[in-house]
């Protein structure tokens, strides 16, 4: 990752964000249950306020969330869809507040409350020495489990660069505490080098990055632009693909990580078939706890030729 210039980190326009970082530092020192309870309240408030005309930013996120849930869960009644959307807001806000603990209060040991299931699958995949692609989705507990996951295995992580220098500094610094390498999504050569070195690379494969680097594959029964890089990376060094999902249990104030056996016969040589398979495992993980998925992102932004826009 390119180093941030002090002039950009400490310019006057960055001062308000530094104030938010200071607030986040304080939040990270609250008891975990308090953080979750605050997240519940703020999540409910954000969902309620998003229905007001002046809350345009949240209104946009609510529109995207409502649309995604309506498309992906047509079997639910309108009232059930609304409840799921509200709960999604709650878990998204809780997830944003939870990050303050591993990133800004690393002395707090979250490992006893983080359970890793299926670690033997990751260890078996790594034993071959060809590197491992640890593929997951954008669940709201994706960053809070970093401390527990890094204690179980030595992992590199791929991330998406933030345009604001302070947020970029914070997310990279926070992740560098727990992962061997923090790689920008665009740095394809670094991914290949690390797989050649036998490294485990964790990344989420469920965002819409446009048609140029994607194929269309069904996701919840809807054609979605799905990155084909997973197939290429796996084929490059014969790297096995292991799926990862993560959830929180608010009743016990704990988190869980679930690792699957390596996908068999992957890649198949058919990018659409491979993308469909990845979408299927992500969808199955979402259905276990749909409220904990990040429905705020425009998963169906890129449409097949001739298809109507959904947002």
Regions found by a protein language model. Name each.
Residues 2-11, 33, 71, 82-86, ...:
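Non-catalytic C-terminal accessory region of glycerolipid acyltransferases
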Residues 115, 181-183, 260:
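General small-molecule cofactor/ligand-binding pocket signal
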Residues 25, 68, 148, 173-174, ...:
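Generic structural signal for isolated residues within well-ordered alpha-helices
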Residues 57-64, 161-165, 223-227:
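Active-site metal-coordination segments of metallo-dependent hydrolases
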Residues 128-186, 208-218, 252:
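Catalytic core of membrane glycerolipid acyltransferases/transacylases, capturing the structured
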Residues 2-136, 170-173, 179:
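Membrane-anchoring hydrophobic helices of lipid-metabolizing enzymes
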Residues 22, 64, 120, 144, ...:
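Short Gly/charged-rich anion-binding patches and loops
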């Amino acid at each position: 990752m390119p180093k941030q210039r002090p002039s950009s980190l400490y310019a006057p326009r960055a001062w308000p964000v530094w104030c938010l970082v200071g607030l986040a530092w304080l939040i990270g020192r609250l008891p975990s249950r308090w953080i979750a309870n605050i997240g519940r309240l703020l999540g409910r408030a954000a969902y309620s306020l998003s229905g007001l005309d002046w809350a345009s930013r949240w209104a946009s996120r609510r529109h995207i969330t409502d649309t995604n849930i309506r498309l992906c869960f047509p079997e639910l009644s309108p009232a059930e869809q609304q409840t799921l959307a509200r709960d999604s807001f709650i878990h998204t806000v809780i997830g944003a507040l939870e990050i303050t603990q591993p990133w800004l209060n690393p002395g707090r040991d979250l490992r006893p409350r983080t359970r890793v299931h299926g670690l033997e699958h990751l260890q078996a995949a790594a034993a071959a020495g060809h590197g491992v692609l640890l593929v997951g989705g954008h669940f709201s507990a994706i960053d809070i489990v970093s401390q527990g996951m890094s204690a179980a295995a030595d992992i590199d992580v791929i991330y998406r660069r933030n345009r604001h220098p302070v947020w970029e500094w914070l997310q990279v610094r926070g992740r560098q505490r727990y992962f061997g390498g923090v790689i920008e999504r665009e740095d394809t050569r670094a991914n290949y080098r690390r797989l050649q070195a036998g490294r485990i690379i964790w990344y989420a494969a469920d965002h819409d990055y446009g048609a140029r680097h994607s194929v269309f594959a069904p996701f919840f029964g809807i054609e979605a632009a799905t990155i084909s890089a997973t197939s290429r990376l796996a084929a490059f060094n014969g790297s096995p693909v292991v799926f990862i999902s993560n959830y929180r249990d608010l009743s016990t104030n704990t988190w869980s990580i679930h690792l699957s056996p390596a996908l068999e016969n992957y890649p198949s040589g058919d990018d659409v078939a491979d993308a469909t398979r990845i979408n299927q495992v992500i969808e199955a993980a979402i259905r276990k706890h749909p409220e904990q998925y990040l429905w705020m992102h425009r998963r169906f932004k890129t449409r097949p030729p001739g298809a109507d826009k959904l947002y």
